[in-house]
């Protein structure tokens, strides 16, 4: 699991050292860890890499000025965790500011760390000699909620997702409006009405409209796959440009096998024209986001589809079949040897 690398900072604080295997995670492209190393090294950590990664902070963690080489979510969280217990002040520049990063910062602040700049790409953290316990409600998963909305829109359904912060979905609302899908925001909810135009808006300059991903608050890469499936069921043509990961688009060949009208231009770009009548298929989930997208495609398809390797979907979507059944999906989980 990729998030396992986040044990490094807490172990450095408690034991002065840590040793672990390189992180895993979805194979969606080159996912570097140098940003983690940049943050920890600046705060006084020595790092040695062989078959494992060895971290040592023999003199303890010391505050410093840190410029992350990329606005990585986990690298920002790693550096925040270390800075929260480091001596002195740490300034993190080019920090990620996704909702779950801000949520961790809020928790650390409750536990005693002094953090300024939450929600921005510059964080100033004055570490605490010791963190205390705190009560905290974890922020809702904007990717899970966004995926459910996309799947409901793809199947022509209606859904209200509750206990979410609509501010986290401003870019999604804008992108989906250009696809002919309107979302309605409540105080703590998002509603997808049943009546939609489902007609993609033309590009003002006469070209093919483009949906591209970027670092927060731009359109999130984690919603790209389900949005591609949505586009196969809408009227019009759109170019998807995945700027962050070079292997995110590889699942589209499965959609083409199901009958989608799509062209893979290169590892980063796909053109989709809709609507297409998808056919059922048997396939294996390649990663979390492609898996939930292919599950959505199966819901749109005629006939019964079988999706294997669902443990990857489970990593990002807990009890997904129960939630989809509540929305009217005909879906069942079966125990198979390949999923043991």
Task: Tell what function each PLM region has.
Residues 1-340:
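Short, structured segments at the rim of ligand-binding sites
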């Amino acid at each position: 699991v990729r998030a396992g690398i986040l044990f490094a900072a807490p172990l450095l604080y408690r034991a002065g050292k840590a040793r672990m295997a390189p992180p895993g995670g979805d194979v969606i492209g080159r996912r570097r860890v140098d940003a983690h190393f940049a943050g920890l090294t600046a705060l006084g950590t020595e790092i040695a890499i062989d078959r494992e990664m060895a971290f040592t902070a023999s003199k303890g963690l010391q505050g410093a000025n840190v410029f992350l080489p990329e606005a990585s979510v986990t690298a920002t969280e790693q550096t925040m965790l270390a800075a929260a217990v480091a001596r002195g002040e740490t300034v993190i520049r080019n920090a990620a500011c996704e909702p779950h990063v801000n949520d961790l910062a809020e928790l650390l602040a409750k536990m005693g760390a002094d953090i300024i700049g939450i929600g921005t790409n510059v964080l100033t953290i004055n570490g605490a000699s010791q963190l205390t316990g705190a009560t905290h409600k974890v922020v809702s998963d904007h990717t899970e909620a966004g995926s459910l909305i996309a799947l409901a829109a793809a199947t022509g359904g209606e859904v209200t997702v509750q206990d979410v912060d609509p501010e986290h979905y401003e870019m999604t609302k804008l992108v989906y409006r250009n696809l002919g899908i309107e979302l309605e925001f409540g105080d703590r909810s998002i509603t997808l009405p049943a009546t939609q135009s489902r007609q993609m808006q033309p590009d003002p300059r006469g070209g093919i409209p483009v949906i591209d991903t970027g670092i927060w608050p731009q359109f999130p890469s984690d919603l790209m796959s389900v949005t591609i499936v949505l586009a196969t069921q809408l009227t019009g043509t759109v170019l998807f440009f995945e700027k962050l990961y070079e292997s995110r688009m590889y699942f589209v060949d499965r959609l083409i096998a199901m009958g989608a009208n799509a062209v893979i231009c290169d590892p980063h770009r796909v053109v989709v024209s809709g609507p297409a009548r998808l056919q059922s298929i048997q396939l294996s989930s390649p990663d979390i986001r492609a898996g939930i997208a292919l599950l959505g495609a199966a819901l749109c398809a005629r006939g019964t589809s079988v999706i294997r390797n669902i443990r990857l979907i489970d990593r990002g979507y807990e009890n997904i079949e129960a939630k989809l059944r509540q929305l009217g999906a005909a879906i069942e989980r079966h125990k198979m040897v390949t999923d043991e």
